[in-house]
Swiss-Prot record:
May be involved in the maintenance of both the function and the viability of sensory neurons, including photoreceptors and olfactory neurons. In the retina, isoform 1 may be required for rod function and isoform 2 for cone viability and function. Disruption phenotype: At 10 months of age, mutant animals show signs of photoreceptor dysfunction. The progressive loss of cone function is followed by cone cell death, while in rods, the outer segment length id reduced, but not rod cell death is not observed. At 12 months, mice present a stronger age-dependent impairment of fine odor discrimination than their wild-type counterparts. Both isoforms are expressed in retina, in the photoreceptor layer, and throughout the olfactory sensory neuron layer of the nasal epithelium, in neurons. Also expressed at low levels in brain and testis. Transmembrane segments: none annotated. Belongs to the nucleoredoxin family. This is Nucleoredoxin-like protein 2. InterPro entries: RdCVF2, Thioredoxin-like_fold, Thioredoxin-like_sf. Residues 9-147 form the Thioredoxin domain. It comes from the Eukaryota. Pfam families: Thioredoxin_8.
Length: 156
């Protein structure tokens, strides 16, 4: 379980609530800081969606990977609209959870979109997940898995 999200509840784009401990157990986690009103976010989100779908949803053996959306939208309604329109079937920190702001501060988010890939203890594997996906596609995931220390036997 990713320590930084311990005790938190996450939501799906359909509104289902899940416990972070269960959903993130033994997975590489990417915190996705973005907003629907941000054109770079709207540009990158479909690429992230394809990346996630290939690794998790459509894979013969789903990869140990999860995205957690940390919204920078102006309202819960904007967040949900963005999630329903462009997001993959990943998770999100609820809009009204004040922890969103703590995560932005902890991971020094000064611009969006930003994809921060973290270890189970919350340490950063890379804060350049967006760039790595754009440049290397699925190949970057193996590096993340190796850096995470937990999933060394995964082969994509």
């Amino acid at each position: 379980m990713v320590d930084v999200l311990g005790g938190r509840r996450l939501v799906t784009r359909e509104g289902t609530v899940v416990e972070a401990e269960v959903a993130l157990q033994n997975k590489v986690v990417a915190l996705y800081f973005a907003a629907g009103r941000c054109s770079p976010s709207r540009d990158f989100t479909p690429l992230l969606c394809d990346f996630y779908t290939e690794l998790v949803s459509e894979a013969r053996r789903p990869a140990p990977f999860e995205v957690v959306f940390v919204s920078a939208d102006g309202s819960a309604e904007e967040m949900l609209d963005f999630m329903r329109e462009l997001h993959g079937s990943w998770l999100a920190l609820p809009f009204h959870d004040p922890y969103r702001h703590e995560l932005k501060k902890r991971y020094e988010i000064t611009a969006i979109p930003k994809l921060v890939v973290i270890k189970q203890n919350g340490a950063v594997i890379t804060n350049k997940g967006r760039k790595q996906i754009r440049e290397r596609g699925l190949a970057c995931f193996q590096n993340w898995v190796e850096a995470a220390d937990v999933f060394q036997n995964f082969s994509g």
